[in-house]
Every structure is written in structure tokens, then in C-alpha cells.
Amino acid sequence: MKLQEIKDFVKELRGLSQEELAKKENELKKELFDLRFQAAAGQLDQTARLNEVKKQIARVKTVQAETKE
């Protein structure tokens, strides 16, 4: 992801409720699980997508922590 895409993603996250953030986190975790499965089977072409999804999950958790305060 490029810097502007990251900023837009975080801006979008900040507009979501806690329930929507939890749903987004679950979707990303499911995608990460699927990507790991593909990587183990040797079918994953975009290996960088693994790290990208991990970082997106971290961003979601950060925004969740910000809004809980």
C-alpha cells in the first residue's frame, strides 16, 4: 500500500463504530487465514499480501484502542 492509500484506509476506519471495526478485523483475520493456507500449499502468488493484511489488522486494532478511550 502506498502512503495515501494507508491514510485513506485509516480515515475510513476512524469513521466506523466499534461493531463495524470488530467485523472488519474478523474479515481481515479470515483473509489472513486463507492466505496462510495458500502459502502452505504453495499456491500463493502475492506473498507481500500476507504482511499487508497483518498491518491492516494492526491498524484496525489501533483505531479500536483510540476510540475506546
Curated annotation (Swiss-Prot):
It comes from the Bacteria. One of its GO terms (biological process) is translation. Keywords: Ribonucleoprotein, Ribosomal protein. Pfam families: Ribosomal_L29. GO terms for molecular function: structural constituent of ribosome. Disulfide bonds: none annotated. GO terms for cellular component: cytosolic large ribosomal subunit. Belongs to the universal ribosomal protein uL29 family. PANTHER family: 60S RIBOSOMAL PROTEIN L35/50S RIBOSOMAL PROTEIN L29, LARGE RIBOSOMAL SUBUNIT PROTEIN UL29C. This is Large ribosomal subunit protein uL29. It comes from Streptococcus mutans serotype c (strain ATCC 700610 / UA159). The gene is rpmC.
